């Protein structure tokens, strides 16, 4: 069986909501929610936080230590390099894979991570994603990419492909074996990530309704379908383009 390494990209230098990954949600830092989701998936053999060398991100390293997980520090905009550093820190070898998680998605469902892990097979897949058909809310996304694929794209990926790690793979489907995990019910019209103050308002409201522990994606979607007033809180927030980094 391949080793699965959860790599959580996190930094404090967000332009729209600075220090968002350290923000309290239900009494816990947002980053802690993501670490908890990775742990409760019961499929991750290691968890590594991939942050930057910026001075302010020392706070991310300190929080990772308090949570009992490793951290690596690398270039701000070259997230691919940070992921390779994280894989090395976890002693990844050929056949192992990285579960790509972002620290601004505190409502990640551990079961979705487990579903993706069940699909990943190094003999048949290089990349597993929940978002290949664009049916999942921004904030529930999970990706698994083989360490071999990361090393393969490292010499050729540039710009946004390095900042966002996996676009090169999806743009070259003839070169990589891609599998998609469909998540029902569809939720692409919803947004449960944390980029702006309006997102924080929605996440606070969801946690107030559902509790301060990890909840299932289905419970979150059901709540938002029943409460259009909550959906309206961040419906105006635009998705940041890939080129923005």
Describe each PLM feature range.
Residues 85-90, 107-135:
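Conserved donor-nucleotide/metal-binding helix-loop-beta segment in metal-dependent transferases, i.e.
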Residues 1-17:
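N-terminal nucleotide-binding beta1-loop-alpha1 segment
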Residues 115-126, 146-161, 171:
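Basic phosphate/pyrophosphate-binding loop/patch that engages nucleotide-derived ligands
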Residues 98-99:
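Short aromatic/hydrophobic "clamp" motif used to bind/position activated sugar donors
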Residues 32-94:
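Conserved N-terminal catalytic core of the sugar/cofactor nucleotidyltransferase
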Residues 142-152, 197-200:
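Conserved nucleotide-sugar donor-binding
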Residues 163-245:
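Conserved alpha/beta core of the MobA/IspD/sugar-nucleotide pyrophosphorylase nucleotidyltransferase superfamily
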Residues 17-40:
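Short, well-formed alpha-helical segments that are part of the catalytic scaffolds
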């Amino acid at each position: 069986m391949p080793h699965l390494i959860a790599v959580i990209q996190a930094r404090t230098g967000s332009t729209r909501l600075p220090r968002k990954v350290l923000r309290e949600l239900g009494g816990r830092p947002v980053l802690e929610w993501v670490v908890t989701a990775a742990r409760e998936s019961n499929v991750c053999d290691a968890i590594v936080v991939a942050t930057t060398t910026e001075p302010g991100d020392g706070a991310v390293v300190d929080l990772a230590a308090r949570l009992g997980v490793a951290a690596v520090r690398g270039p701000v905009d070259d997230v691919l390099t940070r992921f390779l550093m994280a894989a090395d820190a976890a002693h990844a070898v050929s056949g192992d894979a990285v579960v790509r998680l972002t620290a601004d998605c505190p409502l990640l469902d551990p079961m979705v991570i487990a579903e993706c892990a069940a699909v990943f097979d190094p003999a048949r897949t290089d990349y597993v994603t929940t978002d290949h058909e664009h049916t999942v809310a921004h904030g529930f996304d999970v990706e698994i990419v083989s360490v071999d694929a990361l090393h393969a794209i490292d010499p050729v990926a540039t710009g946004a492909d390095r900042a966002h790690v996996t676009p090169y793979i999806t743009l070259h489907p003839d070169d990589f074996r891609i599998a998609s995990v469909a998540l029902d019910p569809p939720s692409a019209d919803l947004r449960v990530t944390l980029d702006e103050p309006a997102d924080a308002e929605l996440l606070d409201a969801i946690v107030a309704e559902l509790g301060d522990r990890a909840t299932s994606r289905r419970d979150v979607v059901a709540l938002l379908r029943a409460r259009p007033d909550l959906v309206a809180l961040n419906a105006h927030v635009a998705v940041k383009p890939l080129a923005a980094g």
